[in-house]
Amino acid sequence: MSRYRGPKLRITRRLGALPGLTQKQSKKKGRPGQHGKSNEADNSKKTTEYGIRLEEKQKLKFNYGLTESQLYRYIKEARRRKGVTGLILLQLLEMRLDTICFTLGFAPTIASARQLVNHGHITVNDNVVSIPSFQCQINDVIGIKPKATSKNLVEGNLQTIKQVDLPTHLKFDKSKQEATVINYCDRNELLLNLDELLVIEYYSRR
């Protein structure tokens, strides 16, 4: 399945805030497609066990901009590793290069961070990496390609994006405009409101 490229606010009206997808908020009330009608039937559908798990899975998929096959590969990798599967899944996604660039404020969304990486503007340990899904490791240094075009693009984003406190697994050096990965992400610092256990349960029969 291809990556979603439709209206972002339609998704956030249905699933709630997805910081990796968009920072904008819809002025419309209710879920898309209701047109002012009662949402009793919709709520009934939503509250089935399958419906709840599906919605949590969709949150993860849209927030990180993944295809269904990509998400399932991360699920399988998280299962393979020792530890709490749900936490490992989130750590894998947060260690993606495009996610880290978004978290640092190099780009306003994960989708735009993906383009930033694709176009060769980002370095890892002084080497240009153009693979958005690249798995960063502890002690990796994430920087900007030393060219005016790259620096102007990222610095412009850093000045305009409303940056919240940086999570503790990243350390940013403003003077060098680079960040060091110092740990795996802390579950309590993630901006996405999600029950990852329900995502794991959704895929439990696959």
Swiss-Prot record:
PROSITE patterns: RIBOSOMAL_S4, S4. Its main location: plastid. GO terms for biological process: ribosomal small subunit biogenesis; translation. SMART domains: Ribosomal_S4 (SM01390), S4 (SM00363). GO terms for molecular function: rRNA binding; structural constituent of ribosome. SUPFAM superfamilies: Alpha-L RNA-binding motif. Residues 37-50 have a biased composition (Basic and acidic residues). InterPro entries: Ribosomal_uS4 (IPR022801), Ribosomal_uS4_bac-type (IPR005709), Ribosomal_uS4_CS (IPR018079), Ribosomal_uS4_N (IPR001912), S4_RNA-bd (IPR002942), S4_RNA-bd_sf (IPR036986). It is found in: Plastid, Chloroplast. Residues 95-157 form the S4 RNA-binding domain. Keywords: Chloroplast, Plastid, Ribonucleoprotein, Ribosomal protein, RNA-binding, rRNA-binding. One of its GO terms (cellular component) is chloroplast. Residues 1-13, 25-34 have a biased composition (Basic residues). The keyword DNA damage does not apply. Residues 1-50 are annotated as: Disordered. The keyword Ribosomal protein applies. Transmembrane segments: none annotated. Part of the 30S ribosomal subunit. Contacts protein S5. The interaction surface between S4 and S5 is involved in control of translational fidelity. NCBIfam families: PRK05327.1, rpsD_bact. Belongs to the universal ribosomal protein uS4 family. One of the primary rRNA binding proteins, it binds directly to 16S rRNA where it nucleates assembly of the body of the 30S subunit. With S5 and S12 plays an important role in translational accuracy. HAMAP family: Ribosomal_uS4_B (MF_01306_B). This is Small ribosomal subunit protein uS4c. The lineage of its organism: Eukaryota, Sar, Stramenopiles, Ochrophyta, Bacillariophyta.
